[in-house]
Amino acid sequence: MRLKRLRKELIKRGAIPYLITDLKNIKYLTGFSGSNGYLIVSEKNSIFISDSRYEEYAKSVIPEDCEFFLQEGNAFEAISSTIKKRGIKEIYVEASN
């Protein structure tokens, strides 16, 4: 539900996908409360990225319309690979807290 609201907001603001890195915001949007996760939200879908420690847990708590992507290697490589595979040309990055 919260992700759907964020998607609607993205559409209003030009539909550029958003990379969320703050775990508090990820928990608020997805329910995931682990220590490693990244969320890419676009107007069409959401992609949750985490390592194998959290695969089963993440799949059990993230919304059904949020795809899980297994992080192999470092986080930057996983995020970069996901962005390239989706053909994303621009992305907003959450400001650090």
Language-model features and meaning:
Residues 66-76:
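Short acidic-hydrophobic, aromatic-tinged amphipathic segments that line or gate anion-handling sites
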Residues 1-49, 76-89:
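Terminal domain-start leader segments
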Residues 21-23, 50-52, 72-73, 93-97:
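Structural motif
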Residues 35, 54-57:
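Short, surface-exposed beta-strand-loop junctions and turns on beta-sheet-rich folds
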Residues 57-65:
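A short, polar/proline- and glycine-enriched secondary-structure boundary/capping micro-motif
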